[in-house]
């Protein structure tokens, strides 16, 4: 078993997930990266990095956890970053749209944490980061309404994990960013990228949250690139 802490990160091939992986690697973490098409990142040390072919829409969380444990013997943190957005209003959308987003944004991270719950508890300070969204705190527009339904649920999921694991040393945080300079954001807004939060900045936030002690628990962490009434 490795003596270094081990983090499982979903959606790790690009954007926020890749930035988080890079940040944690620089801090000495061992990584298990969930990717639809596994490719070893340039910054990664192969001996300290496990790649798992993983698509949140298809499941396979229990197998991923099993493979990571077989490779490294422990799991200290889960970063549930994989997510999708279908930009439709609650009126225009079909059930299939909602089902697709719930499958990736809510059900998949729940299954991943469920599968890793015992090894997280075994560390005495397991950490769970649910990448939610400011859309999990307010509904900003008509076309974000359906997405917001799933992100409100993702925030609730994080709170549920926190309640279930707190006595075991598990701490869960819902990280709620606004626009981040990623492919997803570029596809839905004409906001200049230089005015968005950078993935590397969000990675700094996640690393800070994971590094806090058990007596400094943060339930939610909102990050905005613009002035809003509450964020």
Give a label for each model feature.
Residues 89-90, 97-102:
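Substrate-binding pocket helix/loop in short-chain dehydrogenase/reductase
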Residues 133:
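Residue(s) in the substrate-gating loop at a strand-loop-helix junction
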Residues 27-43:
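Conserved glycine-rich Rossmann-like NAD(P)H-binding loop of the short-chain dehydrogenase/reductase
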Residues 167-170, 174, 191-231:
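C-terminal helical subdomain
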Residues 46-59:
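Rossmann-fold cofactor-recognition segment
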Residues 113, 150:
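Active-site helix of classical SDR
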Residues 13-14:
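Conserved glycine-rich cofactor-binding loop
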